[in-house]
């Protein structure tokens, strides 16, 4: 503990020194520019940093292929032109127009997102690209019969930035103002990335289905990403229009979008430091190629091709630079790791044995399926299934491949709505609820094929599961309000406690490792810990011992029993290893073709003629 506090204090000092150095550089940089041309490039670089970070929220954090982003940039610019120029003879102050245009642009982002985010991949890209092209056509053609946009001639003679009646016309002052807002966006991006919102977006990017199964409201989060990116783009558009004192349709065309995407991809999708570096490099480097005309634009493509060949993850990648976790355990941790070959006699066990309650099976139904049927076209995957899982019971489902076991999990967890029948949890009808609502009710699951968030750390994988239990929004996160700080402390406490149940396999230096760096067995353990971190009452484990060797299978078997006996979980298990089923089960249900063949204790079900026939086939006469 003391060592961790010392490390944290050291990191804070490093960050303070780094921030001071960056502040000094930004303060003196305008005076180091050789002429006004390079001062303008320096100022525009700050603007591109804002734009790249705004796109990084949508494409980098949330993984959405948004091709309408440049239109939001334009909406912000033209909003300033409408409200602070002679065009409509309206001259609102900059400090009023800036938040107003950002909010208006965010509204457009929300509207576009609410109508298009049910689409994915290429279809989303096509719709958002169409929006950007329609916006460009409106800019070009809304100059008659009433001149709204100025057409191809744009709108000029915009008001310069003014504060309380004092106009800012100095190029150096403009550079300070734009870089001031760029720094705010950088700092805000860091805070968002490390928060519940950042973890939710990253989970969606990694695996949208798994994210929702861990309690993330994916629709709302994608809308928030769209709106947040549009807000930043709108603010950048306002700053651009006030700096240039004019706006034209070709300021917001498709090549501009390509440049911004290049900045994000060059730096590394999702990596804030990398995106800032990408924006700086691609703002300055092409200026050295300006004399070559058409070849200047080709440089962007060439840079991307070389980067994709040599470093597909971008300059900084996604996690490595920002992750302060150790790559290898130190001597002390190595000792713990070697001493913890028995999964259940970890330091946690030795420290707090007295607080562990013992539970017995209850008679109260926790989960109940009533005549549930699921059809996929002409195929009936589940056929009139009824079952009850009692409080603190382990109920195992067995059956050959294709029997409908995982489909039952998908029905209970809300991935599929049943064709017929009802699902009840603790007496409440949860039929038709979305996965994140099912998680909030108290049901969590693992998957037959591992669905971890591979590029997220072990600790962040578990933290995602607390999403539905927390409420902090962007304002609370950006200003680190007490509610947000309290939720983060509670999230860390809960997730570290659940990971700690697996001892050194998922704790210590492993907290900061990517999930993909774990062994297969530890990935299985992490998926169980992640499900437990949702504060679930019912765990649905889909083949938890799959891929494990005999020793690992024994360990996970004992751990599942411990979840029931020591921690009071109710558990529904799908398992093909019958020795595991026999060891852990209070009751067993056998399925075949979606129908219940037998139900009872292990021996009754294993010796049932129909179950034997389902596994081995019908005996010939």
Short names for language-model regions:
Residues 1-341:
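Transmembrane alpha-helices and adjacent helix-loop boundaries
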Residues 398-400:
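The feature captures the beta-strand-to-loop junction immediately N-terminal to the Walker
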């Amino acid at each position: 503990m003391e060592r961790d506090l010392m490390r944290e204090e050291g990191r804070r000092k490093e960050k303070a020194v780094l921030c001071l150095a960056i502040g000094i550089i930004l303060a003196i940089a305008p005076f180091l520019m050789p002429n006004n041309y390079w001062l303008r490039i320096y100022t525009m670089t700050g603007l591109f940093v804002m734009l790249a970070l705004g796109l990084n929220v949508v494409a980098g954090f949330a993984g959405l292929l948004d091709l309408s982003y440049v239109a939001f940039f334009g909406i912000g610019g033209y909003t300033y032109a409408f409200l602070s120029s002679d065009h409509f003879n309206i001259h609102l102050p900059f400090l009023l127009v800036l938040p107003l245009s950002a909010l208006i642009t965010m509204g457009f982002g929300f509207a576009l997102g609410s109508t298009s985010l049910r689409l994915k991949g290429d279809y989303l890209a096509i719709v958002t690209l169409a929006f950007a092209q329609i916006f460009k056509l409106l800019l070009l053609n809304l100059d008659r019969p009433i001149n709204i946009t100025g057409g191809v001639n744009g709108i000029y003679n915009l008001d310069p930035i003014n504060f309380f009646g004092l106009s800012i016309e100095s190029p150096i002052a403009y550079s300070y103002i734009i870089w001031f807002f760029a720094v705010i966006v950088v700092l805000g991006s860091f805070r968002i990335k490390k928060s519940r919102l950042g973890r939710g977006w990253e989970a969606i990017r990694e695996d949208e289905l798994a994210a929702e199964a861990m309690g993330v409201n994916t629709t709302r989060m994608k809308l928030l990403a769209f709106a947040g990116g549009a807000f930043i783009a709108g603010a950048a558009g306002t700053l651009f229009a006030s700096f240039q004192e004019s706006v034209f349709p070709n300021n917001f065309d498709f090549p501009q979008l390509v440049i911004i995407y290049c900045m994000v991809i060059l730096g590394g999708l999702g990596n804030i430091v990398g995106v800032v570096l990408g924006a700086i490099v691609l703002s300055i480097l092409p200026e050295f190629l300006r004399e070559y005309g058409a070849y200047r634009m080709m440089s962007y493509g060439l840079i991307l091709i070389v980067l994709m060949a040599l470093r597909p993850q971008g300059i900084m990648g996604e996690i490595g630079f920002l992750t302060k976790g150790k790559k290898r355990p130190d001597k002390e941790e190595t000792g713990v790791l070697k001493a913890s070959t028995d999964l259940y006699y970890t330091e946690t066990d030795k420290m707090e044995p007295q607080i562990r309650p013992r539970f017995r099976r209850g008679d109260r139904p926790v989960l109940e399926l009533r005549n549930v049927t699921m059809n996929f076209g002409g195929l009936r995957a589940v056929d009139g299934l009824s079952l009850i899982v009692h409080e603190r019971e382990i109920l195992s489902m067995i059956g050959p491949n294709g029997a409908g076991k995982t489909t039952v999990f998908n029905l209970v967890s809300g991935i599929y709505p049943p064709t017929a029948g009802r699902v009840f949890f603790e007496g409440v009808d949860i039929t038709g609820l979305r996965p994140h609502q099912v998680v909030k009710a108290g049901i969590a699951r693992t998957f037959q094929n591992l669905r971890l968030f591979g590029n997220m750390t072990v600790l962040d994988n578990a933290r995602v599961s607390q999403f539905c239990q927390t409420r902090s929004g962007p304002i609370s996160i950006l200003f680190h309000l007490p509610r947000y700080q309290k939720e983060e402390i509670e999230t860390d406490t809960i997730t570290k406690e659940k990971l700690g149940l697996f001892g050194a396999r998922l704790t210590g230096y492993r907290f900061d490792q990517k999930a993909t760096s774990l062994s297969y067995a530890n990935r299985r353990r992490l998926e169980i810990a992640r499900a437990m971190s949702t504060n679930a009452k019912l765990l649905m484990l889909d083949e938890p011992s799959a891929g494990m060797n005999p020793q690992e299978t024994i360990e996970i078997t004992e751990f599942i029993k411990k979840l029931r006996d020591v921690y009071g979980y109710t558990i529904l298990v799908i398992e093909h290893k019958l020795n595991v089923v026999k060891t852990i089960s209070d009751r067993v249900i056998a399925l075949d073709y979606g129908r219940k063949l037998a139900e009872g204790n292990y021996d009754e079900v294993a010796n049932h003629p129909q179950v034997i026939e389902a596994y081995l086939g019908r005996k010939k006469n």
